[in-house]
Amino acid sequence: MATLYREFKPSVIYLTNGKKLNQNLTNVFLKNSTLVYLKGTYTMEANMQTIRRVEFDDRQYDVIEGQLAELIDSVGNDCVYRVDYLDMDAYQAQLKNNINISNISLGDQISTSTVDLNTEEDFKFPLVHKYYMCYNGETFPVHEREIWRRLPKDKDIRRMFKTIITKQGFSWTSDESVSELLRAIISVSKTEQ
């Protein structure tokens, strides 16, 4: 099963009705970035409509569009989140590439052997990252056009935005770049007030 952690681990789950649950055996299912938990010998998928936040010992997730979004950075109430998905096409290709099939002709006989080269230690799940920004109380996908629409009409803020996103090394798929962008927007917005 494609999960974030090798082993299921404890978490604190905050529900939309205000209740708080301590769950011993939970994990993040990477196929659709949802919470899964163990109930006896069964792995169950949580109803994401009832969950507001999940806290593991090393990460915090808020639910955005029905998926667990990891909190990457925050300044006050403004935040950057990342949703990690399993890239199913790359995953299938990786599985196929890691199986070695050889056909050796021995007269009229064909010997076929299959060796599974997938070991848990070596195997890395191919992930796709989607970023979200919470700015001025509104949560939206991190995309140039989406951010531009929500920026104040101030020339300095818009110039700073263009400068950052055209800077060498900036990437829309990098935690550091997206965090830097959020912090710059917040700092310039505060100096303009």
Describe each PLM feature range.
Residues L4-Y14:
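A short, Trp-centered hydrophobic/proline-enriched beta-strand micro-motif
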Residues Y5-R6, F125, G169:
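Generic detector of short alpha-helix boundary/capping microenvironments
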Residues Y14, K19-V142:
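Aromatic-patch recognition
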Residues Q49-R52, Q67, E146-I147, D156, ...:
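Exposed alpha-helical structural elements
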Residues V128-K162:
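Flexible, solvent-exposed short loops/turns enriched in glycine
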Residues L151-Q193:
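Long, compositionally biased interface segments
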